[in-house]
């Protein structure tokens, strides 16, 4: 199902809960690295494996700028199928919207043995003060899962930008560290669902534009020294694209 509602600085947004993804309670899928897919999934399928599939294709939410996101609900609907097709096209796979062995193998190629993704590491998302995921607005386990979900969207963004390296300057922030730097009191960084990005050689405006297709519901304006992205709608918050649709 797709919902279509109407590394170093401060998130301005404010953040309420939506089905399947929560602000206070966990956003956990219970997955580990090298996910053990046991079946081909098609539209109409349900289950934990569908949830994991949705997490991994969430960055393929739209073809053009759109307040659309892949719902992480374990229900393989049209939005999930469309995201699978976009993923397949991007990686040179047969485009059929069916998550079979070839698609699953490519999805698993995007993960590392520790559960992070191919081009992003847990350390990039650690609180810059404590070096861990403790002290936020949710548990460390929830922060880690939120960061993992962000990584898969960032993998999609990286692919859409031509496989250029993306540096995460700021990921999760503890409440204490966020206060030290003057961050917003309910910053998405406190939940592990936000990242401030630096993409050398690529204009922030271009990063912003590509991020508009990746299911990011929070985008800070692009005319600053980084590009902020977050998934606040996954926590029930309203969409916020500071520079609008470009």
Spans of model-derived segments:
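A mature extracytoplasmic/lumenal domain signature
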Residues: 99, 111, 170-172, 199-201, ...
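C-terminal region of N-terminal signal peptides and the immediate post-cleavage residues
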Residues: 24-39
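N-terminal secretory signal peptides and thylakoid transit peptides that target proteins
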Residues: 1-21
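Extended, low-complexity, intrinsically disordered C-terminal regulatory tails
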Residues: 155-181
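Active-site acidic/histidine clusters and adjacent loop/turn architecture
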Residues: 116-161
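Short acidic, glycine/serine/threonine-rich helix-capping segments at coil-helix boundaries
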Residues: 37-109
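Catalytic cores and adjacent binding grooves of peptidoglycan-active enzymes
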Residues: 105, 184-246
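Surface-exposed patches in mature extracellular/periplasmic domains of secreted proteins
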Residues: 65-72, 95-98, 163-172, 216-223
């Amino acid at each position: 199902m797709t919902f279509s509602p109407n590394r170093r600085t401060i998130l301005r947004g404010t953040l309420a809960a939506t089905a399947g993804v929560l602000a206070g309670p966990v956003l956990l899928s219970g997955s580990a690295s090298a996910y053990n897919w046991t079946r081909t999934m098609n539209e109409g399928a349900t289950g934990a494996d569908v949830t994991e599939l949705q997490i991994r294709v969430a960055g393929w939410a739209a073809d053009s700028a759109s307040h659309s996101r892949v719902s992480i609900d374990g229900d393989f609907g049209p939005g999930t199928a469309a995201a699978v097709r976009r993923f397949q096209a991007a990686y040179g796979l047969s485009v059929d919207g069916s998550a079979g062995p070839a698609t699953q193998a490519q999805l698993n190629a995007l993960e590392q043995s520790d559960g992070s993704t191919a081009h992003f590491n847990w350390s990039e998302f650690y609180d810059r003060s404590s070096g861990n995921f403790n002290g936020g607005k949710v548990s460390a386990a929830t922060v880690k899962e939120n960061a993992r979900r962000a990584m898969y969207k960032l993998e999609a963004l990286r692919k859409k930008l031509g496989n250029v390296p993306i540096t995460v300057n700021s990921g999760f922030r503890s409440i204490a560290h966020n206060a030290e730097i003057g961050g917003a009191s309910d910053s998405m960084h406190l939940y592990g669902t936000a990242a401030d990005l630096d993409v050398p050689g690529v204009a922030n405006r271009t990063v912003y534009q590509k991020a508009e297709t990746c299911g990011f519901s929070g985008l800070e304006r692009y005319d600053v020294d980084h590009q902020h992205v977050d998934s606040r709608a996954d926590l029930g918050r309203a969409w916020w694209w500071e520079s609008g649709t470009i």
